[in-house]
Amino acid sequence: MRLAAVGHEVVLGSRSAERAEEVRAGLLELWPGRELAIGAADNAGAAAADVVVVATPWDGAAPTVAALAEALDGKVVISMANALTRVGKEFQPLIPPRGSVAADVQAAVPGALVAAAFHHVPAKELGALDHPVECDVLVCSDHPTATEVTSALIADIPGMRALDAGRLTAAGAIESLTAVLIGMNVRYRTRLSVRLTGLPGE
């Protein structure tokens, strides 16, 4: 929604094109006064995009991209999933086989340029198009091109600032922090995001 709101053409993917169309129609109903270039397709159709964002539940991310490995070869793929589990009233981070969801995604599509990003942006804030999302987005990747492309997309969204968090080995810590933020959201009855200070030039 946010990327479509700033002029990018977005294609929603799902295992079935019909399901993707249902989601698309529901999103457009939320903002009837806006012209949003949002299409719908099955996962193979969505994988034809220049940049692919994987927004599945964490345990479905790697299998989903693995089935599309040929289509994703050479493309920037952005992983935004967090491996979390609920224990009682708390969310706790899980450690995927390769240390992070993003690393699992990269292993599933070795020819793709995987970046991890958008982990700490509240979903409701992303969908509230009438105001900016004031936050920093930590981006990490083993591919400079993926970091650059992802950071450029983030810069297009009002209020967001992309920060290069290094190689993909940082993704585990970045993803795990989400559990802390969710717990604080419950405690303070709010929707927290991340903003870092002390950067050069501030």
Would you name each region that the model predicts?
Residues 21, 48, 74, 111-114:
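A glycine-biased structural micro-motif
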Residues 135-202:
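Active-site-lining helix/loop region of Rossmann-like oxidoreductase modules
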Residues 113-122, 166:
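Conserved beta-loop-beta element that borders a ligand/cofactor-binding pocket
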Residues 1-29, 156:
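NAD(P)+-binding Rossmann beta1-loop-alpha1 motif at the extreme N-terminus of oxidoreductases
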Residues 30-76, 83-89:
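Rossmann-like NAD(P)-binding element
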Residues 77-99, 116:
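Conserved Rossmann-fold NAD(P)-dependent oxidoreductase catalytic core, especially the SDR/UDP-sugar
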Residues 90-98, 127-145:
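Short beta-strand and adjoining strand-loop segment in the mid-core
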